[in-house]
Amino acid sequence: MSKLAAFNFQQWIDEHQHLLKPPVGNVQIWENTDMMVTVVGGPNQRTDFHDDPVEEFFYQLKGDMVLKIIEEGKCHDLFIREGDIFFLPPHVRHSPQRPMPGSIGLVIEPKRPEGAKDAFEWYCFKCDGLVHRVEVLLKSIVRDLPPIYQAFYQDEQARTCPQCGELHPGKEPPQGWVTLLENKEQDKS
């Protein structure tokens, strides 16, 4: 008899709902596979930008999210609405923002090639300069990220912008940094 079996994804989400909100916010469905399949719940906001050496696939199952992206040195918002999918190429700096309570997204990414490092970057809210960058061999999003964030939040020197001297706020973004447009038609322009 085969040990392989399908399962009801919605039932799995319902059973893990308590983990899909702060402070945990996300759960990997399978461990020790060549794919990181992660379910992420909102509300969840962060101030870092991820430099991922591999592609990421986003599917927004419930609610809306904003993926802040840095392209050509400029930050802009990419709205991923309920039911939308998005494919992010490697090394595009991005910061997933899920301000809606109860929102749920699925993020799938391949295992990193041997020795490939992920990086996490924080930018100055005043001058847009790079404040701090940390590189890591990422094995588990759920286990590996919290210590990286905590180290940055607690280190005032790491949070001081080398360009203008502004102190990065750490965990909490400035008010208004993340907004979901009221008029969803504005997304299409």
Curated annotation (Swiss-Prot):
It catalyses: 3-hydroxyanthranilate + O2 = (2Z,4Z)-2-amino-3-carboxymuconate 6-semialdehyde. It comes from the Bacteria. InterPro entries: 3hydroanth_dOase, RmlC-like_jellyroll, RmlC_Cupin_sf. Pathway: Cofactor biosynthesis; NAD(+) biosynthesis; quinolinate from L-kynurenine: step 3/3. Its cofactor is Fe(2+). Fe cation 1 binds at residues 50, 56, 94. HAMAP family: 3_HAO. Belongs to the 3-HAO family. This is 3-hydroxyanthranilate 3,4-dioxygenase. It comes from Shewanella woodyi (strain ATCC 51908 / MS32). The gene is nbaC.
